[in-house]
Amino acid sequence: MLTMAQWTLIAVLAQLALAGYELWRIHMGLESKRWPQTTGKIGKAWQEDDFVRDIGDEEGTHSVYARYRYRVDARWYDGRRLSYGVTSRVRFNEALDLLHQLRAGGEVDVYYDPGKPQRAVLYPGSSAGNVVLLATWIVGATLTMALR
């Protein structure tokens, strides 16, 4: 049986791991702004309604997804990542903005990592949502330690 101190340690480590992941996403978002671009083709783009609804918000939140193909140095790649920024559980208007240029069969700019061309995004950069999530995990870990 785990002690309260062990549960606290597990909770803090989990929150710090999530903060580390968010920090990586911010870093990759900044890196993606310097990546070269190529032209790709959208295979499919869609949004899904999330089941979690904010109190008083009838629109709820939505997640945006896409599948696309692009070519780098005569080799074809399949991509799924829209951005290192937050593209899930966003407001309806944000989801529509993301989907606006993503029509099946349409061409789209693809930004790829020159050192690892299979890593690509359609929207370079990160978002304020990444910073909010990073801060949330760090504050959560700090409060968990302070309240034990």
Residues covered by each model-derived region:
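Oxidizing extracytosolic/periplasmic lumen-facing domains
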Residues: 2-147
